[in-house]
């Protein structure tokens, strides 16, 4: 992902203002509610029968933290997203058989949740930069599929 210094600064500033675990839990929860077909990958998570069940589910929150920790690590390696996410791409392709389109959907959920948490502090410039990053991460996670 090619980012200008201004975009890198916008990402760093915005990311520094959020609780990553909350962002991850809410983003994954929203993905499962808004796109219910994604729930099939999480059969072992227990009750996902309603929005409140999903958003309150401890396993969703824990996996959301795991997802966002990987995303956060990617923010430290923006010049090598494919390398950073190579093993996760392989896992999701070969073992879990996740539709790579879901990575784009989750990326959009991350941006939506960031906007919700940061309000006016999530400037259009920050959003534009994050959209580039989530697209780059989705592409890196989809790399093994090609």
Curated annotation (Swiss-Prot):
GO molecular function: haptoglobin binding; heme binding; hemoglobin alpha binding; metal ion binding; organic acid binding; oxygen binding; oxygen carrier activity; peroxidase activity
PTM-bearing positions, type N-acetylvaline: 1
Protein origin, superkingdom: Eukaryota
Gene3D superfamilies hit by this protein: Globins
Keywords for the protein's UniProt record, in alphabetical order: Acetylation, Heme, Iron, Metal-binding, Oxygen transport, Phosphoprotein, S-nitrosylation, Transport
Bilayer-crossing regions: none
Residue numbers of Phosphoserine PTMs: 44
Residue ranges constituting the Globin domain according to the UniProt record: 2-146
Modified residues (S-nitrosocysteine): 93
UniProt-listed GO biological process terms: hydrogen peroxide catabolic process
Residues found modified as N6-acetyllysine: 59, 82, 144
GO cellular component: blood microparticle; haptoglobin-hemoglobin complex; hemoglobin complex
Binding site for heme b: 63, 92
Tissue-wise expression: Red blood cells.
Keyword Iron: yes
Function: Involved in oxygen transport from the lung to the various peripheral tissues.
Family, as annotated: Belongs to the globin family.
Subunit details: Heterotetramer of two alpha chains and two beta chains.
Name this protein carries in UniProt: Hemoglobin subunit beta-S/F
């Amino acid at each position: 992902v090619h980012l200008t210094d201004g975009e890198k600064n916008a990402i760093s500033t915005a990311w520094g203002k959020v609780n990553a675990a909350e962002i991850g839990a809410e983003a994954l929860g929203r993905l499962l509610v808004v796109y219910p077909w994604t729930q099939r990958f999480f059969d072992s998570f227990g009750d996902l029968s309603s929005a409140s069940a999903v958003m309150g589910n401890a396993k969703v929150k824990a996996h959301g933290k795991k997802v966002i920790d990987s995303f956060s690590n990617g923010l430290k390696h923006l010049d090598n997203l494919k390398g950073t996410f190579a093993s996760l791409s392989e896992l999701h392709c070969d073992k879990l058989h996740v539709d790579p389109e879901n990575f784009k959907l989750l990326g959009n959920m991350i941006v939506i949740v960031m906007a919700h948490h940061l309000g006016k502090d999530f400037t259009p410039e920050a959003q534009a930069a994050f959209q580039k990053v989530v697209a780059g991460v989705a592409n890196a996670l989809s790399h093994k599929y090609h």
